[in-house]
Amino acid sequence: MITIETELINSTIDALKELISRPPLTEKLLSRPPFKYILDICKAVSAATGFPSPESCNYDDITDREERTAFLTSIIGQITDQLGVPVDVQIKSILAGKDVPKTLRMLVMLAQAAKLFKVRSNSSQPPPQQAPRETVASPPQEDLEALAREKAEKERQRREQEQQERERKERERQEKEREEREKHELESRERAEAEQWKQKQQQQQQQQQSAISPQKSPPKVRFADDDKTRVEEHQPVIERPHFNRPPPSQHSRRMAVTATSEPSAPQPSAMRLVKVVREESSDESNQDLNQNAGQDGGFTMGLDAEWCDEMLPGEFPLDTGAPAPSSTHGELVANILDTAEAYNVALHGDGSKKPTGLSTQRDKKPIDSYSQPVQKLISHISAIIRKSVPYAKHTAFLDEHILTMRTELHTASEAVTKLLSTSLKQESSLKQANNACESKLHSLKEQIYSLRQAQLELLHSTLAL
């Protein structure tokens, strides 16, 4: 199978062998022509046709890189001036031994320019006697020109199709790789943004919950004794926090639980309700009981004044002016009364003092001294709470605004991502259009080149005739 490079080498050999015989035109040398080989070809062509100019080729060898560049620039300029077509080749590529197809095209154009120069130099001489015969033979020349154009057009179309096929495959591969890379980057960026958004939402919810929910103080646990059970057995009582409650008295029944090794001694109850039992065996007892029942309803109560101050509201004063029991009560009632009197004596330290049920002015003074700072503290705390409520509302509003701004930012980022993808697609389409224009321009250059070649062939055939 003949490749494009092999075909170019053969066409180069065909174009140069009509002009020169040395240096040898071999496929090995033309597969990657060195600079010395190109210099020898230019010198041989110049000696045979006078093109390029002998002054520009008057070198045995050129070793300096700048001089080589100047020599190639001069040769390319002369070819362009002679043919009127620019030579599509890079001098650096020729010196480096790269881009061999363009180097071979330059050599072919060198041969064509030399042939054209030779024809023009011969046409400047007096025309030969057979000139009328040439004018008569013009129709066959037109046919040859048409055949040459057709052949060049077919060759050009074939090369153009091959080039377009290669470019199309390369563009498809690059486009596919770019789309996959963009898709992967977009997915990774969206996952990262979604994860970050979820974390921020969770943090905001936690902050809002912590700001809204008040800090509750742990309940205090106390114990109270039960009259119906033993002293050692206690039941836990949960004391709820409340405000505007007067401080407890010194002899309050409630006490905090302390870790002690021995159980505390039982304290006497502050108040006992004793129901009088009627005895039918004694008429005197029945009469006394009936008399007492008419006075106080059949019940005798021993009251603790401090307990009354703590438990009873201030609107219900306790009246302790009940008449003392007479000495003619029964034995059971007498024992109960003696027990109550002994309890009062043990509690107040003096038997002559009777419980009044109301706190004295002396007992209220320490309570007032403690209650006033507590009330001030409560009022200060209430004022601080009232002042902090607007700030809490503003903080909630700020949280809502921040959440809205984050949502808008997320929407804007999505819009920017879409715009970026659209711009990338437009850029790829512009690149494709640019490649198509370049391919068309290249095909036009090839057409011009084929037309020039056909013109040279026609001139050569004219000279042969």
From Swiss-Prot:
InterPro entries tied to this protein: TRAF3IP1, TRAF3IP1_N, TRAF3IP1_N_sf
Main location: other
TM ranges: none
UniProtKB keywords: Cell projection, Cilium, Cilium biogenesis/degradation, Coiled coil, Cytoplasm, Cytoskeleton, Flagellum
Coiled coil: 144-207
Entry's Gene Ontology BP terms: cilium assembly; intraciliary anterograde transport; intraciliary transport; intraciliary transport involved in cilium assembly; regulation of microtubule cytoskeleton organization
Gene3D superfamilies to which the protein is assigned, alphabetical: Microtubule-binding protein MIP-T3
Region named Disordered: 119-301, 347-366
GO molecular function: microtubule binding
Basic and acidic residues bias locations: 146-198, 222-242
Family (UniProt): Belongs to the TRAF3IP1 family.
General function of this protein: Component of the intraflagellar transport complex B (IFT-B) involved in flagellar assembly.
Protein name according to UniProt: Intraflagellar transport protein 54
UniProt organism field: Giardia intestinalis (strain ATCC 50803 / WB clone C6)
